[in-house]
Design a protein with these regions (language model features):
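Cleavable N-terminal signal peptides
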Residues: 10-12, 22
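Short helix-loop boundary/capping segments
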Residues: 133-185
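Solvent-exposed loop and beta-edge segments used for protein-protein assembly and interaction
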Residues: 47-51, 121-123, 174-178, 194-198
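Acidic/polar low-complexity flexible segments
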Residues: 84-90, 193-238
């Protein structure tokens, strides 16, 4: 579903229409009992306040309370994520331009580290920028974009030296009750004003054979808008 909604719209050239039609208020969603409470999105919002952009998602349960079980190995391991797909261009987060769908993701994965500069982050929820693209080999239809062997594309300074278009910036990330929040300095995200967004909770999986696609969207828990139409518009807060 995720891939069909998002990549289909991109192929039709409708992302620009979504940007123009977006509204400057939170995306609100009705609770769904079939969705695990900690991933059942009820509100997603992105605002700019003073010198920061603040991404927030609220859920029906306690945000961050459910984590994937450790498998003891990298291949085939699971990742849980709170995700904000956006209309940002990949060039605005340090990669080459026009590489795919830019999303901010707060993730937990107990079987491996992908922090910048070789740091450890397998035991904490932490933020990433990811660039997504369609791949039919993935159960969810989308992958974090692979870097082919031998290629050396432009990457941001906090790229974790893995063969993916992924960044590991150390943005302040907090979980409090039903909310997860990421605060990003506007000086690092100049294109956020007027951008469009949505909210997603999802599970990802590392390829068991460790080849492309390396990291797939495996299971979409919930999409805030219901149709991934990026109806949110970044607003200026007080």
């Amino acid at each position: 579903m995720f891939a069909k909604l998002l990549t289909g719209a991109l192929a039709a050239g409708t992302l620009s229409l979504w940007v123009g039609a977006a509204h400057s208020h939170p995306i609100e969603a009705k609770p769904v009992e079939a969705v695990t409470a900690s991933f059942d999105i009820i509100e997603t919002v992105v605002v700019t306040k003073k010198d920061k952009a603040i991404f927030t998602t609220r859920v029906r349960g306690t945000a961050g309370s459910d984590k994937p079980a450790a498998t003891g190995k990298f291949e085939g391991s699971d990742v849980y994520a709170y995700v904000w797909p956006t209309s940002l261009n990949s060039g605005e987060i340090g990669f080459e331009r026009d590489q795919g769908i830019v999303a901010l993701a707060v993730t937990f994965h107990p079987d491996f580290d992908d922090a910048a500069y070789g740091g450890r982050n397998r035991d904490v929820w932490h933020p990433h920028w990811v660039v997504l693209n369609e791949d039919k080999a993935c159960k969810g239809g989308l992958k974090v974009t692979d870097i082919p062997n031998g290629q050396k594309p432009k990457v941001p300074p906090t790229w974790p030296k893995v063969p993916l278009l992924i960044d590991s910036p150390d943005y302040p990330t907090t979980f409090k009750g039903d909310a997860v929040e990421v605060s990003i300095p506007l000086s690092l995200l100049g294109g956020i004003g007027g951008a469009s967004f949505d909210g997603v909770t999802a599970g990802l999986k590392v390829n068991g054979n460790l080849h492309s696609p390396l990291l797939c969207v495996d299971n979409v828990f919930k999409v805030a808008s219901g149709n991934l139409s990026l109806p949110g518009k970044v607003a200026t807060g007080k």
